[in-house]
Amino acid sequence: MPEMGTARLKPGREKSVINRHPWLFSGALARVEAEHGGDVDVLAADGRWLARGYYNARSQIQVRLLTWDQDQPLDAGFWRARMQRAVEGRRRLPAWNSSSARLINAESDGLPGLVADLYVDRGSAEAVLVVQALTLGIEVRRQVLYELLPQVITPEAVPQLGTWGRLSVYERSDADTRRLEGMESRVEPVCGPEPATLTVSEDGLAFEVDVRSGHKTGLYLDQSRNRGVVARHCTGAEVLNAFAYTGGFGVHALRAGARSVTDVDTSASALAAGRRNLLRNDLPAQRREEVAGDVFQVLRRYRDAGRLFDVVVLDPPKFAQNTRQVQGATRGYKDINLLGMALLRPGG
């Protein structure tokens, strides 16, 4: 690892650091003496020590902060302790009724740039830990971190996910944020064999997960609880599932007794996976319609034809990759929400 450097702030720019915001943009820095990708001590304009993090000269977010304890070295013990804290925090949560979960969520767990999702296959009881190194600071120490993860993430550490045998680690560092960090994508096995398509459980339902080429790390784990919540409103309902991906909301809705589900997505392959998920759960295929196409255009067509639904699910992708795209993204989110509301029956 590169030696510790320093990043001195411009006068009056220390407030966000004191308030423990994890990012420092280039405009806040007066002078940096550090190696690209190396660790830095962040100093106020008058030289006071404020925090410690890692540095990327090519990113708009030039320093990502890790600790506000001057006596805390950024060694392997630090990273292990942060991982253990993240996993332990999830252990205290109520039962998940799922065999997959995000166990490390970057800044939210004090580990900016590191994501780790665990999928336990319900058939073989083998597990795949899908990891993402999204920042340069994680990239330069990825080997150490990837060796630590299987030591921390064990069946005993997260009993809510059940037991598993062999654990493979697979890297899906292909998010757009790597390009913003000046890095190319990387998708490859870290340890263990190349994973096959998995089948995970969620609230008693089975879902196909392609960790090699599916969206994100294979499944939208952030919507896991929401899929069950939405299903409570779907009994006897006609449901529109826009941006359906592999049909998670639709499968939950049909299990809850929806009269019909219309899955709309741009990806024909994702819709095909949704069809397989339906069959995997012995749900009636005749109550599901799938439409491959531009979601905005499809919803406008439904609006113009006067088609209405009792429940409309909108789970669009990220529309803005940077601040220059925010205005256009805002229009996109406004348009899709207005379209969704126009397709709701009164009381829907």
Language-model features and meaning:
Residues 64-74, 129-142:
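Short histidine-centered catalytic/ligand-binding loop motif
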Residues 104-122, 141-219:
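Non-catalytic substrate-recognition/targeting regions of SAM-dependent transferases
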